[in-house]
Amino acid sequence: MQEEHNYKWVGGRLIYGFGAKGNDAFYSILSGYLIIFITSHLFDTGNKALDNRMVSLVTLIIMVLRIVELFIDPFIGNAIDRTKNSPGHFRPWVVVGGTVSSIILLLLFTNLGGLYAKNAMIYLVVFAILYITMDIFYSFKDVGFWSMLPSLTTDSREREKTATFARLGSTIGGGLVGVLVMPAVIFFSAKATSTGDNRGWFIFALIICLIALISAWGVGLGTREVDSDIRKNKQDTVGVMEIFKALAKNDQLLWAALAYLFYGVGINILGSLEVYYFTYIMGKPKSFSILSIINIFLGLIATSLFPVLSKKFSRKGVFAGCLVFMLGGIAIFTIAGSNLWLVLLAATMFGFPQQMVFLVVLMVITDSVEYGQLKLGHRDESLALSVRPLIDKFGGAISNGVVGQIAIISGMTTGATASSITAAGQLHFKLTMFAFPALMLLIAIGIFSKQIFLTEEKHAEIVAELERTWRTKFDNTTDQVAEKVVTSLDLATPIAGQVIPLAQVNDPTFAAGTLGDGFAIKPSDGRILAPFDATVRQVFTTRHAVGLVGDNGIVLLIHIGLGTVKLRGTGFISYVEEGQHVQQGDELLEFWDPTIKQAGLDDTVIMTVTNSTEFTMMDWLVKPGQAVKATDNILQLHTKA
């Protein structure tokens, strides 16, 4: 039976990975290549002024609607959260959203029967309705698809494997669109032109939309959702206004978001204009595929290189160094002209560090959760982690608007070729493509370098302070014990190993009982189980510690290793979420002991009763040095009369 289960789940991973491929292929053509079709092919009445006016209006409509959609996103999330039916929590939205969005996007790659030439105003209204409908249904599909990952399995290892398949599918899906777009469009076009024609773009869009449609139905029919307590305890979806409020209160989150905003606008504009450069400046649209292939591999290399750089350099150093490297690429771009090798060098220098910049910003935003918790007294994890996707969408929206306008100003609209672009048009284009993004990157460097002080060391200090003060939120918890007339409580160990008195732990804070009395275990395995029925009240983002408030009134902090916050979650797995109720024996955390030892850290697992002052005494039920199994009773706590 186990082999059959594994076989089925491997199939599920493949299907989910294929779903990610279709999802990102769809997003790639929506966010980048629909604009190219609109500016270069859609409007062709022979009246240049009318065509340019339509391009300008349509691209502005897209920009405005994409910004409006940011405020609709929270309602989409809430609608998905409230969905309860037999097919599942997420799969119906993946199928319905994928179907509707694919059909409508394909319609947008047509001239809607020449409607714009008959009545421009009606065309604009119809286009706006179709676009916002398509965008909303795609958001339903996108949110549903990525949110369903935890529901596919309760096994954390399987989640990691499935997520890896999804990331691989996502990289392939988004990257291959860039590789194939111009060769495919030109191949399917009826006319032999350097930019293709309406038929070529429609057939290419048809292929991508079919992939997106089939992959959505594949996920809907080929995966199964598992019900669990984690999903029942899912936090509410975050609204845009709540995000702004969180930014105003958390200065490190605010500055990281601002730096990422300027950076995001810059890279989105330059990235969106690269295909225009190959097409209208160089006259070599097919060569854009070479850049896309290079970027796929460089993205994978950059991601694997990041852990090495982050150990040798500070976050500010990595962030500034990456952006300076990108500025060097922009500088080479300005003198590259039509030299393919110089252009490829410039474009790869610009694209290579982007994954590393993303990871630096993600680390700061993630660490700002604990920073805000210490500063404000409450934890806004969902708010903080909603900031980056919001900025990504906003940057993409601004990019769409700018690209449409610069295409008109530079003369890169319907019927244009590389030879028809004037010197003035090239100058306007290059100023927008190079000077403006360079300015955005310089501003981002300035903000990040001057305002961000949330280093890994600072974050470790914050986590340590939160561990010291965590108990103050749960004073007088033994009142519920007194009501039950309980005079003593047994405290079990959450992990197997050798018992160590707390005073012998190699940490003065724990050893002195500053965080409360308790005991420690030299672990013999890496599974942390709930020692009693309890509610999870704290799960650190580094997954090295968990705080429980027991149904019996005991407030317990379980801390894996000493100095392990520095590992930033590497080698640790969390099976629970804040607010989740667990029963004795449920698995809370898991860690890979060799990771801790290879980092030169102490792997001792420490348990402190942070409300130990509410008990009169603690008696040992086992001898120090004795080997115990998980959930064996270690201490007996006596309540106050």
Curated annotation (Swiss-Prot):
SUPFAM superfamilies: Duplicated hybrid motif, MFS general substrate transporter. The gene is rafP. The PTS EIIA type-1 domain may serve a regulatory function, through its phosphorylation activity. It holds the Pfam family MFS_2. One of its GO terms (molecular function) is symporter activity. Residues 1-506 are annotated as: Permease. Its EC number is 2.7.1.-. GO terms for biological process: phosphoenolpyruvate-dependent sugar phosphotransferase system; sodium ion transport. Residues 507-611 form the PTS EIIA type-1 domain. The modification Phosphohistidine is found at residue 559. This is Raffinose carrier protein. CDD domains: MFS_MelB_like (cd17332), PTS_IIA_glc (cd00210).
